[in-house]
Amino acid sequence: MVDYVIQDWQGQTAGNITVELRVAKEESAAAIVHRALIRQLANARQGTHASKTRSEVRGGGRKPWKQKGTGRARAGSIRSPLWRGGGVIFGPKPRDYSVKMNRKERRLALRTALISRSADLVVVQEFADQISRPKTRDVAEALTRWGVEPGVKVLLITADRDQNVELSVRNLPNVKLITATNLNIFDLLNADRIVSTSAALEKIQEVYGG
């Protein structure tokens, strides 16, 4: 159980919220979060890398010169791996890098990662109604009022998508905007500071609570 102070758009205290999420035991927390992170990064790989073997490279069917009598080294194909333009030995081939992990474990890792970042988490009121039109400066100034240092990597979590918020945030190079349902291990661990709306935290408890 963790208690957070909720800040309004101006950075003033507007209430409190309690987050209750079941997390992994201390001795296994790092391991399960690490497994979930490795899974996410592995599953993001396309695995479409490919190289051609000597049998797949175009040409090379004819013996370049006779076996004996030329004084040159023996050669059976111009596509030998020893030749320029030849095939590749043990080169990369398309493969599936995906890693399986039980859903219960994935959610446990996500909850554990979120609670582990409690000291870096700032909770604010829903602010979409404060942005009547896309304005990057408004969001940048709000982050400063909420105590977020300039230049640090920020993960901004909202309950739902809002076009004005998205357009205002996308010009801030160090800020990543996601919704509560798109919460993931990498973004949680990669950010220096996490800013979440109170509604987003409630949705996280509803979706991932256990």
UniProtKB/Swiss-Prot annotation:
Any one Pfam family match given in the protein's UniProt record, by short name: Ribosomal_L4
Keywords: Ribonucleoprotein, Ribosomal protein, RNA-binding, rRNA-binding
A single cellular component GO annotation: ribosome
GO biological process: translation
UniProt superkingdom: Bacteria
Comp. bias (Basic residues): 60-71
Keyword Ubl conjugation applies: no
GO molecular function, one term: structural constituent of ribosome
Chain segments carrying region Disordered: 43-80
HAMAP family in the record: Ribosomal_uL4_B
Protein family membership: Belongs to the universal ribosomal protein uL4 family.
Functional summary from the UniProt entry: One of the primary rRNA binding proteins, this protein initially binds near the 5'-end of the 23S rRNA. It is important during the early stages of 50S assembly. It makes multiple contacts with different domains of the 23S rRNA in the assembled 50S subunit and ribosome.
Subunit structure: Part of the 50S ribosomal subunit.
Protein name, as recorded: Large ribosomal subunit protein uL4
Name of the gene: rplD
